[in-house]
Each structure stands twice: as C-alpha cells, then as structure tokens.
Amino acid sequence: LVDPAVADSLQPALAAGLDGVTVRFERFGGECTHAEIDRITAAAATPGSAAEVIVAMGGGKTIDTAKAAAIRTGARMVIVPTIASTDAPCSAVAVVYDAHGVFAETLRFSRNPDTVVMDPDVIVAAPPRFFAAGIGDALSTFFEARSNAESRTDNYVAGGFPRTLAGLAIAETCQAVLRRDGIKAMIAVRAGLCTTAVENIIEANTLLSGLGFENCGCSAAHGIHDALTRLDETHGLLHG
C-alpha cells in the first residue's frame, strides 16, 4: 500500500528490491476510513492470490490502513515510513476517520507490526513540517504518561492494564532525547542533512514515543486533538 505522494519516486526502487517476489501495488486513497480499510482488505484477500505480507509505504494514515487490513487477513505487517511525523509505525492501533477527516474511533489490535524499516535519507528528503509534527506528537508522550501515572489511571490503550515502569522509563527517555536533540535535528533537516541528532529524533518520534504511549496510555493532549478534528479548519493540519 503506497502513499500517492511518494509512489512515483519510491515505488520503482521498492519493486526492484523485490525482484522474484509476486507484488501487487495499491495506492492509498488519502484517508484512513472504514471504507478504505475494507477496500485494501479485499485487495489483500483476493482468492487464489491472497497476500502473505502487507507492506505500508507512506505516512501515518497509510500505515494505519495497512495495519488494519493485515489484522483482518492474517498477513504479516512490514512498515516503511517515508516521514517521521507520528508514532504510528510501531503501534498496534489504528486511528480511523470519516470521509471528511473527522475522528471516528481508534482500533486496537492483538499484535504490532512485524518489521519497521526507516531510511533516514528518505525522512530528510520529506518536507520539514512532517519532521516537526513528529516531534510535536512525541512531546506529548511523557506528559500523558506522567499524568496517567500520577493519577493512577490504568492504561486504556492496552485494555485497562496498569502501566509498566519500563514504559514510563521509555517515555522519559523520549522526552530527554527531544529536548537534547530536537532543535539541532530540525536545523539539520531544514538544511537537508542527516546527522546523529536527526537519527536520534527519528527513533524518538517513532519507536520511543510508540512504546511510551502504548505502555502508559494517552491523556488530555490526544483527547483534545480528537475533539478538534470536528472543526473543518483543522483538517489540513498534521496530527503533531
């Protein structure tokens, strides 16, 4: 499943790397809706040629759609993010919207993606605002984790189980990396450079934030975000 924004530039390289493997490319429809999930599920479950692996190449909504389809079909999940704008790649959840971009629900899955592959050069080549949005999303991880810990709120993301100390430690590390390397990384990304700080922020935006929110839960920041999606003026804004 390929995001149309990167299909022309990245799809040929992906196809070449999968020489000898039967591959079918589907272009993402632009919104993670139930209808789009149904469409991709049907494509992946075609009788006689059902997909063994679903690969998602693109941003968070492309990734969430592919994850939902993989869960429905039993296929393995390989995630290839082309931007570091959210912590969707590593998580076992998908955020579903309606056709107008209004938040509908969050789907929770029984398993996480099998593999996440990120090329820092691809991330740096994307518009810097996506990288900044990923920092914004990841910045909420520690504060929401701490909020849940201090209020002794169970982790609803994980079905009501208590938080883990390891999860809270990861959320704290995520925050520390963002504060230490965030500004340096943004300067580098705007200059088109891949530096150690950039690679650290890619890890924080994607892995540390993903593990942090799944093991500690979300709180006010994401609740306010979900409500704001009901305003038409917010539909062009990024999640972070």
Regions found by a protein language model. Name each.
Residues 1, 55-57, 117:
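Structural motif
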Residues 155-240:
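Active-site segments that bind and position negatively charged phosphate/pyrophosphate groups
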Residues 71-166:
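A glycine/threonine-rich phosphate-anchoring loop and its flanking beta-alpha core
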Residues 1-53:
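ATP/NTP phosphate-donor binding region
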Residues 47-69, 73-82:
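A short, small-residue-rich loop immediately preceding and capping a beta-strand
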Residues 7-10, 34-37, 61-67, 86-90, ...:
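Short glycine/serine/threonine-rich phosphate/pyrophosphate-binding segments
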Residues 13, 39, 43, 68, ...:
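Alpha-helical scaffold segments in soluble metabolic enzymes
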